[in-house]
Amino acid sequence: MGMSFSHLLIVLLIIFVLFGAGKLPQVMSDLAKGLKAFKDGMKDDGNDNDRKNN
């Protein structure tokens, strides 16, 4: 039940309409920073669990 190309295109079009061309780069930058922070947090959480088990 993944997203097809047409669904992805519609979602991107809606995002473009909501945020406009001027804000889109800032929104994407903030999203990328958030994803990076989430991944780093998950990586740190895994390291904490390894230390607790030893």
UniProtKB/Swiss-Prot annotation:
Keyword Cytoplasm carried by entry: no
Protein name: Sec-independent protein translocase protein TatA
Major place of residence: membrane
Bilayer topology term: Single-pass membrane protein
Organism: Rickettsia canadensis (strain McKiel)
Annotated keywords: Cell inner membrane, Cell membrane, Membrane, Protein transport, Translocation, Transmembrane, Transmembrane helix, Transport
Lineage, top ranks: Bacteria, Pseudomonadati, Pseudomonadota, Alphaproteobacteria, Rickettsiales
One GO location term (cellular component): TAT protein transport complex
Record-stated family: Belongs to the TatA/E family.
Transmembrane segment boundaries: 1-21
InterPro entries: TatA/B/E (IPR003369), TatA/E (IPR006312)
